[in-house]
Amino acid sequence: FKGGGPYGQGVTRGQDLSGKDF
């Protein structure tokens, strides 16, 4: 996965740090 949550490109997981999918 490529980061796309509220933390931007730095989060490279299936979920962001809030636990939301992206």
Swiss-Prot record:
Region (Disordered): 1-22
Cellular component, GO annotation: chloroplast thylakoid lumen
Protein origin, superkingdom: Eukaryota
Chief subcellular location: plastid
Keyword Chloroplast: yes
Keywords: Chloroplast, Plastid, Thylakoid
UniProt keyword Plastid present: yes
Compartments (UniProt record): Plastid, Chloroplast thylakoid lumen
Membership in a protein family: To A.thaliana At2g44920.
Protein name: Thylakoid lumenal 11 kDa protein
